């Protein structure tokens, strides 16, 4: 016997719920909370990088460079850019024996 047949029973009109008091305010509130939780979870998974970056740095684009000399700022920018750049001309070939 499958789990589906234990919870819901197919009828001629469609799927019938065995809950007798589905109009109970507590059941309605729990359903609304469950649906909102699902929506928020989906949005969190879709936009987690944007959300947590915004929480970490606020509206700024990155860590603060206030009080840092201009030469060090330029060096930091170069390091960040070099970490992002990919040299397509160099690949590592690994041969398995």
Curated annotation (Swiss-Prot):
The record marks 37 as: Essential for channel activity, possibly by being protonated during channel activation, and by forming the channel gate and the selective filter. InterPro entries: Flu_M2 (IPR002089). It is a single-pass type III membrane protein. It is found in: Virion membrane; Host apical cell membrane. The modification Phosphoserine is found at residue 64. One of its GO terms (biological process) is symbiont-mediated suppression of host autophagy. The chain crosses the membrane at residues 23-43. Residues 61-80 are annotated as: Disordered. Residues 1-22 are virion surface. The record marks 41 as: Seems to be involved in pH gating. The M2 protein from most influenza A strains is inhibited by amantadine and rimantadine, resulting in viral uncoating incapacity. Emergence of amantadine-resistant variants is usually rapid. A lipid is attached at residue 50 (S-palmitoyl cysteine). Residues 44-97 are intravirion. GO terms for cellular component: host cell plasma membrane; membrane; virion membrane. Keywords: Disulfide bond, Host cell membrane, Host membrane, Host-virus interaction, Hydrogen ion transport, Inhibition of host autophagy by virus, Ion channel, Ion transport, Lipoprotein, Membrane, Palmitate, Phosphoprotein, Signal-anchor, Transmembrane, Transmembrane helix, Transport, Viral ion channel, Virion. One of its GO terms (molecular function) is monoatomic ion channel activity. Belongs to the influenza viruses matrix protein M2 family. When the channel is activated, one or more imidazole moieties of His-37 probably become bi-protonated. Forms a proton-selective ion channel that is necessary for the efficient release of the viral genome during virus entry. After attaching to the cell surface, the virion enters the cell by endocytosis. Acidification of the endosome triggers M2 ion channel activity. Homotetramer; composed of two disulfide-linked dimers held together by non-covalent interactions. May interact with matrix protein 1. Cytoplasmic tail plays an important role in virion assembly and morphogenesis. This is Matrix protein 2. It comes from Influenza A virus (strain A/Chicken/Brescia/1902 H7N7). The lineage of its organism: Viruses, Riboviria, Orthornavirae, Negarnaviricota, Polyploviricotina.
């Amino acid at each position: 016997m499958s789990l589906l047949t234990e919870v819901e029973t197919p009828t001629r009109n469609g799927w019938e719920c065995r809950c007798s008091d589905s109009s109970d305010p507590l059941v309605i509130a729990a359903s609304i909370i469950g649906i909102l939780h699902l929506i928020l979870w989906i949005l969190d998974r879709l936009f987690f990088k944007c959300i947590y970056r915004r929480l970490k740095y606020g509206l700024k684009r990155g860590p603060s460079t206030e009080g840092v000399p201009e030469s060090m700022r330029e060096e930091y920018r170069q390091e960040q850019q070099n970490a992002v750049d990919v040299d397509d001309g160099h690949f590592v070939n690994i041969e398995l024996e």
